[in-house]
Amino acid sequence: MSALIDKINETLAVIKKKTNKNYEVGIILGTGLGGLVKDISIEHEIDYSDLPHFPLSTVESHQGKLIFGMIGGKNVVAMQGRFHFYEGYTMQQITYPVRVMKFLGVKTLLVSNACGGMNPIYQRGDIMLMIDHINLLGDNPLIGKNEDEFGPRFPDMSEPYNLELIKLAEQVALENKVKVQKGVYVAVPGPNLETKAEYRFLRAIGADVVGMSTIPENIVANHMGMRVLGLSIITDEC
């Protein structure tokens, strides 16, 4: 058994003291979006500091809790606060919670982020459904020995965000008269914001919005066979 699986089992042992349920949906709440946890019927919550091998979020707006509860009759586990490359964590540390979620039964992962809008038709406050991404973080969580129990050595990333979930999200948005965009997210390391020349470059290579997260978690979720839906909240017009 690998050291990573040993670590996951140690984390699961703490979680199982609180709950033995199977959680089919995982949620990662991004910067400024932790308040969405109010829509979850909370049954249990565990501070990251109480979970073995979990990193600790250093971002002020991230609460640093793993939330267990229900939404719409579904058992969900939600991260109230995520980890970023610019905080000094490795890609493996950033994505460790996604590995744990898979062992809790998660088959569908909803990831959210706050981002800068570069597409000129996007406005502050718009929601963008992520249809693809560009990884400019300069690293990848799958580098190193592959764990065959998790997934293949060379996972297919031709559809990183599940088309069925995107269509479902569009339908829900239409029914609720919520305007949504669809586009490509590019991740950069940060923590500094981009220069004007960098914004022009990112637009030229096909990105609609820019942020500093989400892609590592998406790669690991795809590696483990999860369906992923990505939501970007445009907080600035770049």
Predicted regions mapped to residue ranges:
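Active-site/ligand-binding-proximal alpha/beta "capping" segment
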Residues: Q171-D208
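Non-catalytic positions within long, well-ordered alpha-helices that form the structural scaffold/packing
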Residues: K102-G105, R203, N222
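Generic non-transmembrane alpha-helical segments
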Residues: V14, K18, E164, L168-K179
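Metabolite-binding pocket within alpha/beta catalytic cores that recognizes anionic/polar moieties
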Residues: S2-M157
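Zn-dependent metallopeptidase/amidohydrolase metal-coordination segment
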Residues: M212-C238
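Short acidic/polar active-site loop segments enriched in Thr and Asp
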Residues: K107-T108, D208, R227
